[in-house]
Regions:
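Phenylalanine-glycine-rich, low-complexity intrinsically disordered regions
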Residues: 1-2
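Transmembrane-helix signature of multi-pass solute transporters
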Residues: 10-11, 110-120, 266-273
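Structural signal for alpha-helical transmembrane segments and their membrane-water exit/capping regions
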Residues: 11-22
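Hydrophobic alpha-helical interface/terminus motif in multipass membrane transporters
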Residues: 19, 61-62, 153
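Short helix-capping/hinge motifs at transmembrane helix termini and TM-loop junctions
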Residues: 22-23, 121-126, 158, 193, ...
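Transmembrane core module of solute transporters
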Residues: 24-148
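Small-residue-rich alpha-helical segments with characteristic i,i+4
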Residues: 131-211
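Hydrophobic transmembrane architecture of multi-pass small-molecule transporters
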Residues: 174-276, 282
Length: 283
């Protein structure tokens, strides 16, 4: 990964150098002078980073509910309904003349509502049937932003910048932002998971009534099945560790869902207070 990162940075610097020194470059850096284009890149970056929170559903169903990949993939199919709802709502609100900033804010609002749903839903007795709701809500918000960002960014954009816009947009939307978002959420999840494992394991010993009773019950059960005492103790310890890991993972997901909600609220306020260029509608 380190060498791949170094290679990507070197290749990027080399590309910029070649394009700057050429008389007729393929990439027009003047595209970055357009304010709507810069806003479009920024909004796509925020969207794709926050969209990495989709991992909450997979982590919760995989760890908390012990579901397989097929059942997780089945949940993903509900995103089509969210895209449909978001598409219809986007068209209807656009026809009504709602300003772009409120539509962008609505998109981040739905992403935040999905995170809020996961915050309150993550628990040891969660229901599989309810996991389709955060998928639908998040997909609805994604459709708002996915469809409107390029429409907003390319307003009155000169045709000569089209290829440069597409190149940069795909780089931000498909490479930079998803990789940064995935790395951020994965590393933070692992770090918070280890934090909660250490925190919960401190109180789990033979002096703890519930932990001690569960441990001894598992040891006796293993011995009844013909296991030796040492094997039974090892399996009981593994079982206790597994329960702690599950609880730690659920706590980490709940905490990250809360921070994602705050991030979405910040993005909502941010896209509303930005100074947008005035549109001149042709009649």
């Amino acid at each position: 990964i380190q060498w791949a990162t170094v290679g990507a940075v070197v290749a990027g610097i080399l590309f910029v150098y070649i394009e700057v020194t050429q008389r007729n470059p393929y990439y027009q850096f003047d595209v970055l002078k357009l304010r709507t284009i810069r806003f479009g890149f920024l909004f796509y970056f925020l969207l794709m980073v926050l969209n990495s929170s989709s991992m909450f559903v997979n982590v919760f169903t995989g760890i908390g509910m012990k579901l397989d990949n097929y059942q997780n993939a089945t949940l993903g199919n509900w995103s089509m309904l969210g895209y449909f709802i978001g598409g219809i709502a986007t068209i209807w609100l656009s026809v009504k003349g709602v300003h772009f900033k409120y539509l962008f804010a609505a998109g981040f609002l739905f992403l935040g509502l999905s995170a809020m749903f996961m915050y309150f839903e993550v628990q040891g007795a969660g229901l599989y049937e309810r996991m389709k709701y955060p998928v639908i809500i998040r997909s609805t918000g994604m459709m708002f932003l996915y469809s409107l960002i390029p429409t907003f960014a390319t307003q009155r954009m000169p045709y000569k910048y089209l290829s440069s816009w597409i190149c940069t947009m795909l780089t931000v939307r498909m490479v930079l932002a998803p990789s940064i978002g995935t790395a951020l959420y994965s590393n933070v999840l692992q770090e918070r998971q280890q934090h909660y494992i250490t925190r919960y394991a401190q109180n789990v010993d033979m002096m703890h009534p519930e932990a001690s009773a569960s441990f001894m019950q598992t040891v006796q059960g293993m011995q009844y099945q013909g296991k030796s005492k040492q094997e039974a103790v090892n399996m009981a310890a593994t079982s206790t560790k597994g329960r702690i890991q599950v609880q730690a993972t659920l706590s980490a997901v709940k905490e990250m869902a809360g921070w994602t909600l705050y991030a979405c609220l910040f993005c909502m306020i941010f896209v509303v207070v930005l100074p947008y260029p005035k549109r001149k509608l042709l009649t």
